[in-house]
């Protein structure tokens, strides 16, 4: 864990500081650098998980639950890896992932925030295209300095998570902008009937959409 943390900090600080003399800025002037908001504690949260998992047919219900849970787990892992690749970072920057959400420690730079914003938008467009409004990803972050990560003063570390939670809650309350709502209302569906599993209008095979068919097929292998 220590090595992973050191690797995470080594990959983050240079993006913020942009210096060559790190001995001067981080060690000799350590106290000053501890107060600089060099980091972003960032989180992504997939909402709609419970409804998605428990939207299953009566036949093979247990396998269906496992398949949908596994699918969401793998999806989050892929999302994390894709975002880290866009940021030119490694999984050393991943603090936690599980249960449809994750936490990452990133550099607090304009470039990082731009990448995060664009990725969140593109990800939710993809979610809408494949799952309509069933799944949505809300993201949030808090700017942090080294002292806050050390919980100095006491309570400052938990305050970071409260800030993130508030940002994510606000986004969940206002999921879509006007353009996305217009797109939803004007979309032409491929099919005319509802999938008997997820109730989404789509092109069906055996009364099931392609997503539900694929998950049903996968359930036999896990």
Regions found by a protein language model. Give the residues of each.
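Regulatory and interdomain segments flanking nucleotide-handling catalytic cores
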Residues: 1-222
């Amino acid at each position: 864990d220590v090595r992973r943390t050191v690797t995470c900090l080594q990959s983050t600080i240079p993006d913020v500081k942009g210096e060559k003399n790190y001995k001067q800025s981080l060690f000799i002037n350590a106290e000053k650098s501890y107060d600089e908001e060099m980091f972003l504690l960032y989180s992504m949260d997939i909402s709609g998980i419970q409804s998605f998992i428990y939207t299953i047919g009566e036949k093979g219900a247990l396998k269906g639950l496992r398949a949908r849970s596994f699918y969401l787990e793998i999806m989050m892992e892929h999302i994390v890896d894709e975002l880290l690749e866009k940021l030119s970072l490694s999984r050393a920057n991943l603090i936690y992932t599980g249960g449809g959400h994750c936490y990452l420690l990133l550099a607090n730079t304009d470039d990082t925030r731009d990448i995060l914003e664009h990725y969140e938008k593109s990800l939710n467009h993809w979610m809408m295209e494949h799952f309509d409004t069933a799944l949505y990803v809300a993201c949030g972050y808090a700017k942090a300095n080294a002292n806050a990560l050390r919980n100095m003063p006491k309570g400052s570390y938990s305050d970071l998570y409260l800030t993130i939670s508030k940002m994510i809650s606000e986004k969940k309350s206002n999921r879509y902008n006007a353009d996305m709502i217009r797109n939803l209302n004007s979309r032409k569906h491929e099919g005319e009937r509802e999938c008997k599993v997820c109730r989404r209008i789509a092109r069906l095979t055996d009364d099931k959409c392609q997503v539900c068919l694929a998950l049903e097929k996968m359930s036999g292998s896990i």
